From Swiss-Prot:
Pfam family, one: tRNA_Me_trans_C
Keyword Endoplasmic reticulum carried by entry: no
Location of this chain's protein in the cell: Cytoplasm
Positions with a binding annotation for ATP: A6, M7, S8, G9, G10, V11, D12, S13, L32, G125
Keyword Cytoplasm: yes
Biological-process GO terms, alphabetical: tRNA wobble position uridine thiolation
Disulfide partners: C101-C193
GO CC terms in record: cytoplasm
Family: Belongs to the MnmA/TRMU family.
Protein name: tRNA-specific 2-thiouridylase MnmA
Catalysed reaction, written as an equation: S-sulfanyl-L-cysteinyl-[protein] + uridine(34) in tRNA + AH2 + ATP = 2-thiouridine(34) in tRNA + L-cysteinyl-[protein] + A + AMP + diphosphate + H(+)
Length: 364
């Protein structure tokens, strides 16, 4: 089988490529150039798409004895990931750019080009398990990335490979060292690659500008402060609110809702964050078939968030989710990923983009 190995320059994708070679596949390595402007992506060992990473990926390919290329996806990345990120925050939403990159770049634009060139699959270093179209959590629960892959369709998964998902991260590093890969001890990347400063608010402000609004008490409606734009806030945020003192009940204040049309940011105590129901649009069902009737499942609403038991039902191209227990910090624009518990690793059932939430009166 001809396999295109997406090599980010990190240890996981290097070992993924190595395992594809060891499995007897005809492997070609490729690194994605994602910025047309030098210096706009992070440089150094902590980046996931920096200039240094391209060199690390090339050296890993040399060790493996496979051809290596750098493909320019800067325009697509800007349009589908960066511009989407900015527009979502301007609309009072909280997007996940890594998730969007998987959906639109790695397993769409990149995979489409790979298939057009005669490749059968794209291998990446994601921590997830995939077999016969079934996407599961990784063996290493701390590194599991099934959440950011939960937006992939059955067709996209049919041409994907995740060779490292069945192995703990520590063992992957050991294997990299055994194979003579210099990236064996390279630190993991954690931040957003196109915000090298790590200052998301400044990045967004430079692109959106000042759009004044008010910070309002969620219970009393009192105006507590003014702000320069809803893009500086996300649901559950506690710091940087521009408000002095706790809520009326003596508890810390959090962002509880964002109203982009009026520029209103409401803040309140933690109880104001609790939701019992989630509505999502852009539903994707991993099996390719939309389920009929209610589905018992667990849901995850953040990349490193916990699971909550729920009942989900497909509704008009979206998903209606009723939670067994309240969740906090649920924001529009986030992905909600549905799982079915399984001893071999929880199975991804599907996902949607959160478009609304609701709470029972007694939780307010």
């Amino acid at each position: 089988m001809r396999v295109l190995a997406a090599m980010s320059g990190g240890v996981d994708s290097a070992v993924a490529a190595a395992r594809a070679v060891a499995a007897g596949h005809d492997v070609v390595g490729v690194h994605l150039a994602l910025s047309a402007e030098p210096g706009t992506l992070r440089t150094g060992s902590r980046g996931c798409c920096s200039k240094e990473d391209a060199g690390d990926a090339r050296r890993a390919a040399d060790v493996l004895g496979i051809p290596f290329y750098v493909w320019d996806f800067a325009d697509r990345f800007k349009e589908d990931v960066i511009d989407d990120f900015v527009a979502s925050y301007a609309a009072g939403e909280t997007p996940n750019p890594c998730l969007r990159c998987n959906e639109k770049i790695k397993f769409a634009a990149l995979a489409d080009r790979a298939i057009a060139l005669g490749f059968d699959a794209v291998a990446t270093g994601h921590y997830a398990q995939l077999e016969n179209g079934v996407l599961r959590r990784a063996v290493d629960a701390d590194k599991d990335q099934s959440y950011v892959l939960g937006v992939l369709t059955a067709e996209q998964l049919s041409r994907a490979m995740f060779p490292v998902g069945d192995t703990p991260k520590d063992r992957i590093r050991e294997e990299a060292a055994e194979r003579g890969l210099a990236v064996a001890n390279k630190p993991d990347s954690h931040d957003i690659c196109f915000i090298p400063s790590g200052d998301t608010r400044a990045f967004l402000g430079a692109r959106i500008g000042v759009r004044p609004g008010s910070v309002v008490d969620a219970d009393s409606g009192e105006v507590l402060a003014e702000h320069e734009g809803v893009h500086g806030f996300t649901i559950g945020q506690r710091k940087g609110l521009g408000v002095q003192g706790p809520a009326a009940d003596g508890q810390p204040r959090y962002v509880t809702s964002i109203e982009p049309d009026t520029g209103t940011v409401r803040v309140g105590s933690a109880r104001n964050l609790e939701v019992d129901a989630i509505t999502a649009d852009r539903a994707v069902w991993t099996s390719g078939s939309t389920p009929v009737g209610p589905v018992e499942c667990t849901v995850q609403v953040r990349a490193h968030g916990g699971l909550a038991e729920a009942v989900a039902e497909a509704v008009d191209g979206g998903i209606a989710i009723s939670l067994r227990e309240p969740l906090t910090g649920v924001a529009k624009g986030q992905a909600v990923v549905l799982y079915r518990t399984d001893p071999a690793g929880d199975i991804v059932l599907g996902s949607g983009t959160i478009s609304g939430t609701d709470a029972r009166p007694n939780t307010q």
